[in-house]
């Protein structure tokens, strides 16, 4: 059995790490490289960096900090933000990223997923999916351009359908960003995770809602996700990664201890 992964998420805007609530009202957390180094030292299994306004601004993630992160840490990391071509992805990988993640660009041009997988291998290609549960219609809908409140909009895709589509096109991993839960620390959306797990054949990463060690345990034990991503609880040191991993191991989760 593969070990489950604990993955701090660093949202980047204007060269700094920020964090919002439900993808809005972002506050500055700190500088990129010191935070990355801290999480690596604390025992994170990998890191994810989202340049949250790159897609909405029509640009690609800033490569200068990617190289600095690669020089500072010795754990895998994934980079996302406005990657629209094989060439742009290749440059980020050449600067030291281990994986690249696409979200809004995949919605705009789904064939990009296949081209990236064919060029770099599925193990390098992550698709991020921003999903919002609409209580009125009791449906889960994919959103795009979520890094910019003014430009965020719903797509025509139901979440489960898009999950199956990106797998068919070559996604090697899926990060499910549950927008309703983002930053509120009330727990991952287990209902949605379980539904997506049933149709997801590739590694599935839960994102949005972690507020206590029990929330990570529930995602692993009930929804059988492969990794759990979180931001504010790590940024604000509400949860220590080493302590979290020991708690999970004591509760039967296969995890790499620090």
Swiss-Prot record:
<feature type="active site">
    <location>
        <position position="130"/>
    </location>
</feature>
<dbReference type="GO" id="GO:0000105">
    <property type="term" value="P:L-histidine biosynthetic process"/>
</dbReference>
<protein>
    <recommendedName>
        <fullName>Imidazole glycerol phosphate synthase subunit HisF</fullName>
        <ecNumber>4.3.2.10</ecNumber>
    </recommendedName>
</protein>
<dbReference type="InterPro" id="IPR004651">
    <property type="entry name" value="HisF"/>
</dbReference>
<dbReference type="GO" id="GO:0016829">
    <property type="term" value="F:lyase activity"/>
</dbReference>
<comment type="pathway">
    <text>Amino-acid biosynthesis; L-histidine biosynthesis; L-histidine from 5-phospho-alpha-D-ribose 1-diphosphate: step 5/9.</text>
</comment>
<keyword id="KW-0963">Cytoplasm</keyword>
<dbReference type="Pfam" id="PF00977">
    <property type="entry name" value="His_biosynth"/>
</dbReference>
<dbReference type="InterPro" id="IPR050064">
    <property type="entry name" value="IGPS_HisA/HisF"/>
</dbReference>
<comment type="function">
    <text>IGPS catalyzes the conversion of PRFAR and glutamine to IGP, AICAR and glutamate. The HisF subunit catalyzes the cyclization activity that produces IGP and AICAR from PRFAR using the ammonia provided by the HisH subunit.</text>
</comment>
<comment type="subunit">
    <text>Heterodimer of HisH and HisF.</text>
</comment>
<dbReference type="GO" id="GO:0000107">
    <property type="term" value="F:imidazoleglycerol-phosphate synthase activity"/>
</dbReference>
<dbReference type="InterPro" id="IPR011060">
    <property type="entry name" value="RibuloseP-bd_barrel"/>
</dbReference>
<dbReference type="InterPro" id="IPR006062">
    <property type="entry name" value="His_biosynth"/>
</dbReference>
<dbReference type="InterPro" id="IPR013785">
    <property type="entry name" value="Aldolase_TIM"/>
</dbReference>
<keyword id="KW-0456">Lyase</keyword>
<feature type="active site">
    <location>
        <position position="11"/>
    </location>
</feature>
<keyword id="KW-0368">Histidine biosynthesis</keyword>
<keyword id="KW-0028">Amino-acid biosynthesis</keyword>
<dbReference type="GO" id="GO:0005737">
    <property type="term" value="C:cytoplasm"/>
</dbReference>
<comment type="similarity">
    <text>Belongs to the HisA/HisF family.</text>
</comment>
């Amino acid at each position: 059995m593969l070990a489950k992964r604990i993955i701090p998420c660093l949202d980047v805007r204007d060269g700094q790490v920020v964090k919002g609530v439900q993808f809005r009202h972002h506050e500055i957390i700190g500088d990129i490289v010191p935070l990355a180094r801290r999480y690596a030292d604390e025992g994170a299994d990998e890191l994810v960096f989202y340049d949250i306004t790159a897609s909405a601004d029509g640009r690609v993630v800033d490569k200068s900090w990617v190289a600095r992160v690669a020089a500072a840490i010795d754990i895998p990391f994934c980079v996302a933000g406005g990657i629209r071509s094989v060439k742009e992805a290749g440059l980020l990988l050449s600067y030291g990223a281990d994986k690249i993640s696409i979200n809004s660009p995949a919605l705009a041009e789904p064939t990009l997923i296949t081209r990236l997988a064919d060029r770099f291998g599925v193990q390098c290609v992550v698709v991020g999916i921003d999903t919002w549960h609409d209580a009125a219609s009791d449906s889960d809908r994919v959103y795009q351009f979520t890094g910019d409140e003014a430009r965020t909009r719903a797509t025509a895709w139901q979440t489960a359908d898009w999950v199956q589509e990106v797998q068919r096109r070559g996604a090697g991993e899926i990060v499910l960003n549950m927008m309703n839960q983002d930053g509120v620390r009330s727990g991952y959306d287990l209902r949605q995770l379980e539904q997506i797990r049933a149709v997801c054949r590739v590694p599935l990463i839960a994102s949005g809602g972690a507020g206590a060690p029990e929330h990570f345990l529930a995602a692993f034990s009930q929804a059988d996700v492969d990794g759990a991503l979180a931001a504010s609880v790590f940024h604000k040191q509400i949860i220590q990664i080493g302590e979290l991993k020991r708690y999970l191991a004591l509760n039967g989760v296969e995890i790499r201890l620090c």
